[in-house]
Amino acid sequence: MPLLNEYIRQLLPEMTQWRRDLHHYAESGWVEFRTASKVAEQLHQLGYDLTLGRDAVDADSRMGLPDEITLANAFQRAREQGAPEPWLSAFEGGFTGIVATLDTGRPGPTLAFRVDMDALDLNEDTDGHHRPFREDFASCNPGMMHACGHDGHTAIGLGLAHVLKQYADRLHGVIKLIFQPAEEGTRGARAMVAAGVVDDVDYFTAIHIGTGVPAGTVVCGSDNFMATTKFDALFTGVAAHAGGKPEDGRNALLAAAQAAIALHAIAPHSAGASRVNVGVMQAGTGRNVVPSGALLKVETRGETEDINRYVFERAREVIHGAAAMYGASVELRLMGAATSSAPSPGWVHYLREQAARVPGVEQAIDRIAAPAGSEDATLMMARVQQHNGLASYMVFGTELSAGHHNEQFDFDENVMAIAVETLALTALNFPWQRGV
């Protein structure tokens, strides 16, 4: 059997090919039909037990789900783009989650590794300096691009699946590989948590590449994610002739505008950082019509769950107050959510020990003082910890061609080998008799 590092280096060209295929056929949240089908096919061929679709994703817990027409069109596109049929049907309707399980048959705990699969709603750059365009693997799906590295994450998950099967005789306990849909907008993890996919997990690790961490650095316990609530506010008023009978109208546009201004005046919290943002406002049908409908797309964030809850509750008060001022009604619809991150110190220490063994890792650290957004893997972390398990979130530094969520985003694909080796060592070196 080859040495682990040698085997992974031999696997890297294939991982790169997988990554570039996924990049070319980018699919955004809840429509990762081709992506999930390709992943499931390969995991099945490796001999993993698979939990798919509705068994891995709770229907009622999905957030920010596209409409039925969008889902149907994306499903048909995936079929036309080569999604393997035996697997494609399992994901129809927006149930694009996968859990691959390797039961060694030997005593030991359950370890889980989570990667995300979705792309962003973004048009990829077509400049000749952009490597994916230059080398002909830029996204062929309009308005969808892997601009955050999730194509790399998925390839890392598949690479890890290959390695664990190759070295299965050295493993103990149960290994679960979680391929999550719809991380962007923090929409997908809650539905997989509700389906119970991490309820039996003793040790949990989620990963990301890049995020401003320099190449050669591995962060083993990222703890700077903010709790967040993402929601739509739908205002309903009464349409009327703006010149003839304006008093008969109830102006939903003005209610939404009042709310948008007032939301940004919510007082900060003394216990830590908070954020609120109105990213979209849509209203009106014509200049001579009192608008009867309006939409705000809003998000709140907090350094802790309590701070985010404070901001969200104040936001709800502001929105309902603005609606009342103009005689309108308003409905709030939850579109995404995540909690703050609190990695388990003992697990972070163990992960740091494994990362430090990997060639190409110059420093393995517990945390890094840098601002972060939000990440719904924190919901999986929290559930594992609620069940007395340990959890953490790792970031593998790499050189980026542009920042995350930018149309020129790309990364150094060598980071995938570093990530796979670190995660493989995490399973292979686990002290199963005493735990961490």
Curated annotation (Swiss-Prot):
Protein name as catalogued: Indole-3-acetyl-aspartic acid hydrolase
Protein keywords: Hydrolase
pH-activity relationship: Optimum pH is 8-8.5.
GO BP annotation list: folic acid catabolic process
Family: Belongs to the peptidase M20 family.
Pfam families assigned: M20_dimer (PF07687), Peptidase_M20 (PF01546)
Gene3D superfamilies linked: Zn peptidases (3.40.630.10)
NCBIfam families registered for this protein in UniProt: amidohydrolases
InterPro entries listed in its UniProt record: AbgA, Amidohydrolase, Bact_exopeptidase_dim_dom, Peptidase_M20, Peptidase_M20/M20A_hydrolases, Peptidase_M20_dimer
Gene Ontology terms: cellular component: cytoplasm
GO molecular function: dipeptidase activity; para-aminobenzoyl-glutamate hydrolase activity
E.C. no: 3.5.1.134
Complexes and interactors: Monomer.
Organism: Enterobacter agglomerans (Erwinia herbicola)
Catalytic activity: (indol-3-yl)acetyl-L-aspartate + H2O = (indol-3-yl)acetate + L-aspartate
Known function: Hydrolyzes indole-3-acetyl-aspartate (IAA-Asp) to indole-3-acetic acid (IAA). Shows an exclusively high substrate specificity for IAA-Asp.
